[in-house]
Structure formats: structure tokens, C-alpha cells
Amino acid sequence: MSLKPKVSHADHILGNGQADLTIVEYGDYQCPHCGAAHPIIKEMMAELGSQIRFVFRNFPLSEMHPYARPAALAAEAAALQGKFWEMHDAIYENQNLLSARLLLDIAEQLDLDMPKFKSDIQDQELLNRVDGDFESGMLSGVNGTPTFFVNGQKFDGGAEDLVQILGEN
């Protein structure tokens, strides 16, 4: 399966925005497999970040993970204040404590404008963005998390497999 839609300026991009290698992760902030993949991806980006364009798209599996969608909204609200990746990392690093209170605590620790953050997490536009990511995942053949795409093609493997293949090339 191929990635739909293609990566654009509207995505959350880390690393080299002009890199020849693009990795897209569809993730769920409460998924334990995504949580386990997070430090592997961080290490990969520390080593190869100048050669990779890494994109994260929300794929909250809300029926199994009740805090996945609120966490996605919190990350999107933080993005409006220029702190998407900081919120993203903090959520995964505290995944075992995930709660509504934790999301507010992280926002405070990131020194976000709290009235704006609290308003933004309820904004229909952010709900639409999270839903749009989810729908794009469905169109792209995502059926679990994490799911990775390498240069637009679905990668059948986990984060460790991805790093191993990148290390070989």
C-alpha cells in the first residue's frame, strides 16, 4: 500500500525537510508498541536525522486506548504554540501515566499559554486534523500501530526492523 496523501507542509516534520528518505509513522500515544518504538526512533533521528525526513501522523485507536485521542489533541494544541515535538516526546516518555491531568501538567511544564491550550484542545479544527490523519491512515492501509511508511510505501516491520534496514544502507 502507498501513503495517501503524500507528505506536505501541513505534516509534523522532524529532521531534514529536504531529505531523500522520508519515514512516516502512524502512531497512537497510548499504544505500548508505539511507546516502545519511540526511543528507537529518537535514537535513529539522533544518528541519521540529517539524512531523514520523519513525519508523525495521529492514528488514535480510541476504543482500546481512551487517552489516545486526548493526547493527540494535546500534541496538536501544543503545535499551535510551536511545541509539537516537545509534547510528543513528553507524552511518550510518560505514557504509563497518561491521563487528562498529565496532559495539562506537560503543557504547563512546556510553558504553554494555558488558557489558549485548554481552548485549543476543544477546537473543531484540531479534531478535524486528528480525524484527517486517522482517515489518511485508513486510506493508506494502516490497521494497527505503529505503522511506518518509507518513501511512500508501507513498511512491513517494526521500528527495530526499520533501523536495521537503514543501518545496512
Language-model regions: role of each:
Residues 3, 11, 62-63, 70, ...:
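Generic detector of short alpha-helix boundary/capping microenvironments
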Residues 3, 20, 26, 33-45, ...:
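C-terminal cap of thioredoxin/glutaredoxin-like
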Residues 4-21:
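A short beta-strand-turn-helix
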Residues 10, 18, 58-62, 74, ...:
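A general structural-boundary detector
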Residues 13-14, 98, 155:
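Short clusters of hydrophobic/aromatic residues that line enzyme substrate/ligand-binding pockets
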Residues 24-25, 29-108, 167:
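Structural alpha/beta surface segment adjacent to cysteine/selenocysteine redox centers
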